[in-house]
Amino acid sequence: MRHIGVFVGVLALALVLLVVEARSDAERGVCACPRIYMPVCGSNLKTYNNDCLLRCEINSDLGRANNLRKIADQACDNLTDNVNDFIPQEY
């Protein structure tokens, strides 16, 4: 019976470490995204290959610090000349 308690304790510790590691990967901008090219434009005027990669960057420390957002469901190069219309303004 004691072995089962030790096993459960080790399993619980491993699960906690796995969750903490996964969270820190997302905060560093490391995400498992599909390799599908459906470009989107971020408020930093950078084109991301797909929405998942942009969301990953948005959830990173740098993305949160810069208030990164999606401004268009297309490549930034394809936006009209008046890009400021797409960027959300803070009031």
Swiss-Prot record:
Gene3D superfamilies: 3.30.60.30. The keyword RNA-binding does not apply. GO terms for molecular function: serine-type endopeptidase inhibitor activity; toxin activity. Disruption phenotype: (Microbial infection) RNAi-mediated knockdown results in increased dengue virus type 2 infection rates and increased number of infection foci per infected midgut following infectious blood meal. One of its GO terms (cellular component) is extracellular space. Induction: Expression in midgut is not affected by blood feeding. Disulfide bonds join 31-56, 33-52, 41-76. This is Kazal-type trypsin inhibitor.
